[in-house]
Amino acid sequence: MVKRLKELLSPIIGVDAAASVIASYDVIGDIAIIKVPEQAFEYRQAVGSAIMNDNKSIKSVWAQVSPVQGEYRLRELANIAGEDRSVTVHRESGCIFSLDVREVYFSPRLSHERERIASLVGEGERVFNMFAGVGAFSIVIAKRVNNVKVYSAEINEAAYRYMLMNIEQNKLKSTVIPILDDARNVAARLRHGVDRVLMPLPERAMEYYEDAIASLDGGGWIHLYLHVKRIRSEDIIYSAKDKLKPYGGSVESYRIVREVGPSTLQLVFDIKFNSI
């Protein structure tokens, strides 16, 4: 994808400008989102057109013009090619997700992680997704595993509305339980009531870690997502174990989910609690 896009752009905007373009882009449904560096922003329409020419399934291209930020983890987007439309339908793992890329946070780059988590959930488990968004983790789990309940908390009203829609269109109304409230309040109501907790909000997960522990029913699993500096793998696990030691539990495994910057990684730690 990277080489192909740069090759398409070089004769249009020049080799130097093409080289500066971050050529990996996210595809969400029929929408593409790309980061266009400042030095190449004047060529943004050419970048958008090149993406659409390279991928005929894409109907709209947006440039990300701000980092992911704020309580709802949103990013400012500017339409640079195709339809001026931000609502789409994304298909993944046999599931359907309706969403507005300007109103909610959604990353297609987490698709493999969603599948991995679903593969770990056992039949009959009670799962608490503390930061559910449009319901992606919750719905993939509920589609894959029999007889589960997935309590799904979200504070962004737009994301919550799309979660309701996605639960309906994936026919999971009795399995995924949507809750419009802060995860801390939901954790208090679910106290000692679940077997597994998902914490896919790296920026703030540690603020809610004690609440996650308190929601476990005598033991279970927490999947904790964090942003960490890129260091040696043995130093990562040592630092994590040292940070989490006061809370109990055992870090059974960890993995790199994705790169989020030149020096930052998103990691997930699979933590087991034998008793609370």
Located regions from the model:
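SAM-dependent transferase fold signal centered on methyltransferase-like domains
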Residues: 1-276
